[in-house]
């Protein structure tokens, strides 16, 4: 009995320092690889001390995906508005600047021809067409009144002027302009535009001159209806003379209108659909 007690005393197991065999053989969870292991304590005081000393930290295996910044959406471009007529009737009857340019060219030729005819014959444009003149305006021919009204409204843009004219790209300068490609005409050798106008006349300038011609022919007809005199006679120009005796200023104006009508201006006509 005494020997048994001695063996038991000598074989005392230190449970605080070493884990038991059962604890070693237990399968350990995956979290024990990442979390710090806590020593096993049996006393309540030791357990409270160790829990307050060691705190468990959570380790994330996969980081959350960073959100991409929102894409900046560019504000929509404002659509350029086409020029309206003077009464806000832009294109109301399908009249565009290209149509107005054609009407202006016809008016330039007609106005120049009427001035030249009056200078040579001494008769105004209506007298040359054997129409009655020297009467009140309300007694004039209805077709003639419509022609006058059409020219006046077209000259001030009241018929509508959809679209616009844009200039051609700038020509080459410096060395590129000095080099003359083979097979070009005499205009290129002088540094002038090959296919465009001779003096840089644009379609916008041509449109303006056409409007002036429309105003001129309309007012000359109105004056001739009322007074019975042509446009030159109203301005006290000498008429009924040979062409070589016509005033130089008058000849210059006639030649200018003829030249502006037949010489194509630079630039091109675009509409809203072509801009889009």
Curated annotation (Swiss-Prot):
UniProt source species: Solanum sogarandinum
Family that this chain belongs to: Belongs to the ELIP/psbS family.
PANTHER family: UPF0041 BRAIN PROTEIN 44-RELATED
SUPFAM superfamilies: Chlorophyll a-b binding protein
Record's function text: Seems to be involved in non-photochemical quenching, a process maintains the balance between dissipation and utilization of light energy to minimize generation of oxidizing molecules, thereby protecting the plant against photo-oxidative damage.
Example GO biological process: photosynthesis
Keywords: Chloroplast, Membrane, Photosynthesis, Photosystem II, Plastid, Repeat, Thylakoid, Transit peptide, Transmembrane, Transmembrane helix
Transmembrane regions listed in the UniProt entry: 106-126, 140-160, 207-227, 242-262
Family annotation (InterPro entries): Chloroa_b-bind (IPR022796)
Name of the protein: Photosystem II 22 kDa protein, chloroplastic
Start and stop residues of the Sequence repeats: 62-168, 169-276
Location(s) in or outside the cell: Plastid, Chloroplast thylakoid membrane
Bilayer topology annotation: Multi-pass membrane protein
Transit peptide start and end: 1-67
Gene Ontology CC: one annotated term: chloroplast thylakoid membrane
Keyword Membrane found: yes
């Amino acid at each position: 009995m005494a020997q048994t007690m001695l063996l038991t005393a000598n074989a005392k197991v230190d449970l605080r320092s070493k884990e038991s065999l059962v604890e070693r053989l237990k399968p350990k969870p995956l979290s024990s690889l990442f979390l710090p292991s806590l020593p096993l304590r049996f006393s309540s005081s030791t357990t409270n001390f160790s829990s307050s000393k060691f705190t468990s930290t959570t380790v994330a295996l996969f980081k959350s995906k960073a959100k991409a910044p929102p894409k900046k959406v560019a504000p929509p471009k404002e659509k350029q508005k086409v020029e309206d007529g003077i009464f806000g009737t832009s294109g109301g009857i399908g009249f565009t600047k290209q149509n107005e340019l054609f009407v202006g060219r016809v008016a330039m030729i007609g106005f120049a021809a009427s001035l030249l005819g009056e200078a040579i014959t001494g008769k105004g444009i209506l007298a040359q067409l054997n129409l009655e003149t020297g009467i009140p305006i309300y007694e004039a021919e209805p077709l003639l009144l419509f022609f006058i009204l059409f020219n006046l409204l077209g000259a001030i843009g009241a018929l509508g002027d959809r679209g616009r004219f844009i200039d051609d790209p700038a020509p080459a300068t410096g060395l590129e302009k000095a080099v003359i490609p083979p097979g070009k005409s005499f205009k290129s050798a002088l540094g002038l535009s090959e296919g465009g106008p001779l003096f840089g006349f644009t379609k916008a300038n041509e449109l303006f001159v056409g409007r002036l011609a429309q105003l001129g022919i309309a007012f000359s007809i109105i004056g001739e209806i009322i007074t019975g005199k042509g446009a030159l006679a109203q301005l006290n120009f000498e008429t009924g003379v040979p062409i070589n005796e016509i005033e130089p200023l008058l000849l210059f104006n006639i030649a200018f209108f003829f030249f502006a009508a037949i010489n194509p201006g630079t630039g091109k006509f675009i509409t809203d659909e072509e801009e889009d």
